[in-house]
């Protein structure tokens, strides 16, 4: 196994300031090397080192930790229950495969939260070793890609049902859905691989940190663009285009009438709202000016925790949007999820345009 190597203090500082898992920068935790460290920092970057104490105040630290804990407490049981219902208790349909894939990606992200919280509480000392430095910080990136690609496929699935219903009726199968999910995970792993390769452990200031291995972070900046384009921009444009064409084809009233549509729209909106600050701040820190980069560093912990929140939201949305809330108190959770994931098209006649619209959406 590769041994830990020494890193220049300036590289370590900047790496820690942009690292997605080592984001809470605390100069006060440094040892006797602090004076030399701050001198080099000010000479290199032109910032007042004392100002960096505000990069992550105690309030931001506490809020982030609370958000992480809530994400874990809601996300693990919620997504586990979705997987149990969709994977074992319901008849297997294309819709249940989509929701099962989303829940798997979200659960993977939620399960990594305790390790991330422990590292934050240890003032970013990395106790998990070199191999986990490659794997653990990449979990959220893999989850992000898998989730957004699944949402994109769901949009294309809805699109084909409306625009090419004959093709969808003949080719929309469980096998194709499963193969699509496999392709989603392969693509997510491939796009996350560069982030895994660049990460390594460094021994500095009497502590071990896990961060990126790149002298000037040019490669990291390029990867930030790749992550934004393939993990946010292209999927967003594709999803908006698909649903825009569907709405134009069917009319806004019919477009909004389906239960499954309302649920999926809420899931899509929640994803992009939770992840947008993450991507925007990442680009600002990589390519923004001095003042904008410092502002981005100050609020970055909240953006990261908000991205994690998305992994616990979907089960909540399934429950509160699957049907009228006043009726939910009379149903078991299992029945609620079954209705949320149901294939409405198998229950409604297609004899009229209105009925066909409802079956698709």
Curated annotation (Swiss-Prot):
Q: Which UniProt keyword terms apply here?
A: Cell membrane, Chemotaxis, Disulfide bond, G-protein coupled receptor, Glycoprotein, Membrane, Receptor, Transducer, Transmembrane, Transmembrane helix
Q: Which GO terms describe its cellular component?
A: plasma membrane
Q: Which Cys pairs does UniProt list as disulfide-bonded?
A: 133-210
Q: Check the record and name the CDD domains matching this protein.
A: 7tmA_C3aR (cd15115)
So which stretches are on the Extracellular side? 1-64, 118-134, 199-224, 284-301
User: What is an example of a GO molecular function annotated in this UniProt entry?
Assistant: G protein-coupled receptor activity
Q: Name one Pfam family in it.
A: 7tm_1
SUPFAM superfamilies, sorted: Family A G protein-coupled receptor-like
* Database matches in PANTHER family: C5A ANAPHYLATOXIN CHEMOTACTIC RECEPTOR 1, CHEMOTACTIC RECEPTOR
Protein's job: Receptor for the chemotactic and inflammatory peptide anaphylatoxin C3a. This receptor stimulates chemotaxis, granule enzyme release and superoxide anion production.
What's the name of the protein?
Answer: C3a anaphylatoxin chemotactic receptor
């Amino acid at each position: 196994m590769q041994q830990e190597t020494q890193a220049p203090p300036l590289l370590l500082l900047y790496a820690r300031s942009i690292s997605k898992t080592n984001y809470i920068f605390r100069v006060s935790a440094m040892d006797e090397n602090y004076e030399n460290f701050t001198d080099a920092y000010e000479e290199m970057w032109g910032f007042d080192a004392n100002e960096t104490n505000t990069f992550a105040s105690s309030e931001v630290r506490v809020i982030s930790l609370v958000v992480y804990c809530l994400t874990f407490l809601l996300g693990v049981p919620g997504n586990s229950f979705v997987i149990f219902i969709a994977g074992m208790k319901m008849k297997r349909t294309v819709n249940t495969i989509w929701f099962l894939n989303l829940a798997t990606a979200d659960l993977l992200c939620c399960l990594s939260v305790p390790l991330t919280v422990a590292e934050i509480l240890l003032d970013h000392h990395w106790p998990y070793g070199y191999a986990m430095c490659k794997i653990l910080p990449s979990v959220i990136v893999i989850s992000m890609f898998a989730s957004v690609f699944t949402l994109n496929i769901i949009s294309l699935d809805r699109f084909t049902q409306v625009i090419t219903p004959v093709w969808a009726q003949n080719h929309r199968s469980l096998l194709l859905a499963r193969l699509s999910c496999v392709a989603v995970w392969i693509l997510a792993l491939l796009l996350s691989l560069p982030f895994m390769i660049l990460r390594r452990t460094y021994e500095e200031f009497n502590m071990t940190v896990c961060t990126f291995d790149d002298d000037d972070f040019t490669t990291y900046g390029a990867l930030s663009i790749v992550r934004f384009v393939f993990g946010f921009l292209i999927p967003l444009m594709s999803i908006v285009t698909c649903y825009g064409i569907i709405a134009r084809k069917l009319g806004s009233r019919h477009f909004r009438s389906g239960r499954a549509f309302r649920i999926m729209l809420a899931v899509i909106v929640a994803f992009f709202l939770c992840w947008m600050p993450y991507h925007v701040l990442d680009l600002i820190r990589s390519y923004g000016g001095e003042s904008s980069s410092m502002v981005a560093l100050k609020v970055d912990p909240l953006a990261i925790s908000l991205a994690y929140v998305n992994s616990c939201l979907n089960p909540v949305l399934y429950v509160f949007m699957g049907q009228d809330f006043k009726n939910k108190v009379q149903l078991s959770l299992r029945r609620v999820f079954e209705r949320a994931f149901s294939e409405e098209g198998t229950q409604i006649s297609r004899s009229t345009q209105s009925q066909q619209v409802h079956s698709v959406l």
